């Protein structure tokens, strides 16, 4: 509530609208991790039921707290003209309370899965850039913490968990068979590309029931997906009440942030794709320009050698 008051806006009109509606966006992060730790597959009926219960709890708790704050500080200014009043909702401090954001970057910092997305893969290569006095680039082998911990507990040792992940990296298309050979429930570890478009949409729709804004969700489709497959995914999202949805066909970009598969480019090829910044000189010449913006004065420093 206090953050809304002190927020800085580039235009006075934006500040006015935000203070009149006082929209906030509580959300979810780490959903896929939770399912793995509970032993539930992302595309199972049990996972949908759990999402329904958690979404309802989050939504009702958020509105209850918003109503409590409204008793102390008053409802949002546009409450009297809002649909919330028409629907019989008591005075609340915020016109909207729930948003499930992408959280793609902050979830990696936090070490958990993003939003309500399934895991992208059990193990993958992250395209990273390391810089030092010479400049180097490489790919980093990674795995979701919940997956690694679950495998370690199931298999008994950290080395065994690593061995399984190495096998999956080499042969990702047979990941479920590899896990089955080691007595693991492959369905629990089913990843984004192995989950049907229908299951992706159903998960989003169940959360959307309890979200007052939008849900960030990607429907992952294989490279072989047709135009009709994409059309069907969007139609199902519309029919199930999703406010917005994104469809991504694997390999539709020349370079992806995350990759699966056994092939790794050698260092020479990587350097062709990843540009390494050259070393900055100790002293450079430069000029400073003062630029007027809608958010005040900005100083831009331009340096060159």
Tell where the protein language model's regions lie, with residue ranges.
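Catalytic alpha/beta core of large soluble enzyme barrels
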Residues: 1-6, 88-89, 98-257, 298-305
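Short, Gly/Pro- and small/polar-rich lid/capping loops
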Residues: 259-303
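Contiguous, well-ordered alpha-helical segments that form the cores/surfaces of helical PPI scaffolds
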Residues: 22-37, 105-108
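Internal maturation/activation junctions in enzymes
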Residues: 1-19, 23, 40-103, 183-188, ...
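A general alpha-helix detector
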Residues: 30-34, 50, 65, 146-150
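Short capping/connector residues at structural and topological boundaries
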Residues: 19, 29, 45-47, 81-84, ...
